């Protein structure tokens, strides 16, 4: 009987361990930027560059300016999600990686806690061109599922301002609060690196529900360029006998030198 109880206890501990979410070991120390074209499989994308977080964090001598920003979200059921984060703008990362932002069609984010495919995909317009905002006056009632203005008025846009999409090196997040209240106590002392790299991008409107898209543990970005590589040859008119051998030299012109070499 004692052996049976011991085995049951061990089994319960094992099950509990398997049920734990991914946390500390999912934190990413480096991030890759990979490039390719629409229709390519994930393994066909070319790794343009890979950076450790120290190479990017200006607090540790890194190359990118980091910023402290607030971000607001709602989940579509009356719950709000607030973030205070320090990190670098995605636009700056792509520029530093040598990616032509104007040629991008879409951007995919891969995370360590999501094993199959991209965790979240955006068109270039949705992530980088569409204005996105922080709404400090946004509050919600989880019981009714309704959103309301924290200041008691009827304008959810009070105090709103535009924000840039970011990959956070450290952050503090909280559910079921409003930005005006959150800002009164959220500070650097609450920062944690436990979700690095953490994607934040704000809201296009107060009602936009996108809490699940604030991806944690990002380790790879797939950049898809619009169009296709252009292939050309100096030989335009070939007069050959059927079955004869002839080497045709083709030149590839892609959106990036790394892709030109690959194609």
Language-model regions, residue ranges each:
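Bacterial N-terminal signal peptides
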Residues: 9-19
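Bacterial N-terminal signal peptides that target proteins for export
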Residues: 1-9
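Short acidic, gly/pro-rich beta-turn/loop elements at beta-sheet edges
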Residues: 18, 119, 258-260
